[in-house]
Amino acid sequence: MTDSPTLALAKDLISRQSVTPEDAGCQDLMIERLKALGFEIEVMVFEDTTNFWARRGTEAPLFAFAGHTDVVPAGPIEQWNTKPFEPTIIDGFLHGRGAADMKGSLASMVVAVEQFIAKHPDHTGSIGFLITSDEEGPFINGTVRVVEALMARGENIDMCIVGEPSSTEYVGDVVKNGRRGSITGDLTIKGTQGHVAYPHLANNPVHSSLLAINELATTEWDKGNDYFPPTSFQIPNVSAGTGASNVIPGEFNVQFNLRFSTELNNDIIVERITNTLDKYDFEYDLKWTFNGDPFLTDAGSLLDAIVDAVGHVNDVKPALLTTGGTSDGRFIARMKGQVVELGPVNATIHKVNECVKVADLEKLTDMYERTLVNLFAK
């Protein structure tokens, strides 16, 4: 049986070992297809990262698909049932690294646009693609750099679908219409190293800071809202001491992360945490990493178009959720447009034997195409 256009492209993309930040020629495949449709292509290479921006049309509004060609490492090869970069179909599922995250989505995007333009060559508005090879890595030279370049010249995306695997049980059951913000603090409490038998000659930073750490961990940061759960404060890493049982440590390192709703922002969090720490009698250093602001698309033409498209294909409307980690949608949201995420089932992403249901790729293609029809068909 001949592969469908979506399946054939997905296989071609998966076969390329684009472990972050490598692209391995994936973007060239997409660019070739988009050029044939009349897209203007702008390749943007920043250090080790390959990106491209493609646009068809000059009219407003500007709708864009966004995604990434890089994948996480395959992990232990011996635990895979197939070779991770040799796309294989087993029992109706396409197996391979990136099948769900997110080469299947990329294939669906391209084919959906091909089908839409074939039927509506004189569509209204403009269609774009923002593709990077730096989403699974440090996200320094990827989407954020392209967004900065576009904003600098006043080219803002009005509506965007990010192809992240948003679904849980079946494709389209969940559409992510927002994401929480993320901020990380690396806290170092200073003390004085000494012998445990002579605590009066030392200053144990673990002891001196426990009450402050407990206060931060038990603080109610907000109550959340209709779209977001309450802000979460978690401590993923702590370290102190030399490993010897008779040495009081000289420093205590605590790393914490907050996933926060639209009720807060970076400045408020920094102020509240600093005020809490300053109440206690210890010396500390605190370094911040701002991973991204929360964003929300609670209404608008894009959300209406997607909900209709998913309902048309599945006969069931999707749930609108903001759960999960961060995505490149947080950078695109800086343009103040509508940003949502719609992609395959995420049950196997980043795992060995990553796979996606072949039928889901066809459904996703139909959802993307109908979204375009709802937005731009004359």
UniProtKB/Swiss-Prot annotation:
Active site per the UniProt annotation: 70, 135 (proton acceptor)
Binding site for Zn(2+) 1: 68, 101, 164
UniProt cofactor note: Binds 2 Zn(2+) or Co(2+) ions per subunit.
InterPro entries in the record: ArgE/DapE_CS, Bact_exopeptidase_dim_dom, DapE_proteobac, Peptidase_M20, Peptidase_M20_dimer, Peptidase_M20A
Family: Belongs to the peptidase M20A family. DapE subfamily.
GO molecular function terms listed in the Swiss-Prot or TrEMBL record: acetylornithine deacetylase activity; cobalt ion binding; succinyl-diaminopimelate desuccinylase activity; zinc ion binding
Keywords: Amino-acid biosynthesis, Cobalt, Diaminopimelate biosynthesis, Hydrolase, Lysine biosynthesis, Metal-binding, Zinc
E.C. numbers: 3.5.1.18
Pfam families for the chain: M20_dimer, Peptidase_M20
Keyword Transmembrane helix among UniProt keywords: no
Catalysed reaction equations from the record: N-succinyl-(2S,6S)-2,6-diaminopimelate + H2O = (2S,6S)-2,6-diaminopimelate + succinate
The protein's annotated pathway: Amino-acid biosynthesis; L-lysine biosynthesis via DAP pathway; LL-2,6-diaminopimelate from (S)-tetrahydrodipicolinate (succinylase route): step 3/3
Cofactors named for this entry: Zn(2+); Co(2+)
Record keyword Amino-acid biosynthesis present: yes
Role of this protein: Catalyzes the hydrolysis of N-succinyl-L,L-diaminopimelic acid (SDAP), forming succinate and LL-2,6-diaminopimelate (DAP), an intermediate involved in the bacterial biosynthesis of lysine and meso-diaminopimelic acid, an essential component of bacterial cell walls.
Assembly mode: Homodimer.
GO biological process, one term: diaminopimelate biosynthetic process
EC main group: hydrolase
Membrane-spanning segments: none
Superkingdom classification of source: Bacteria
Binding site for Zn(2+) 2: 101, 136, 350
Name of the protein: Succinyl-diaminopimelate desuccinylase
CDD domains for this protein: M20_DapE_proteobac (cd03891)
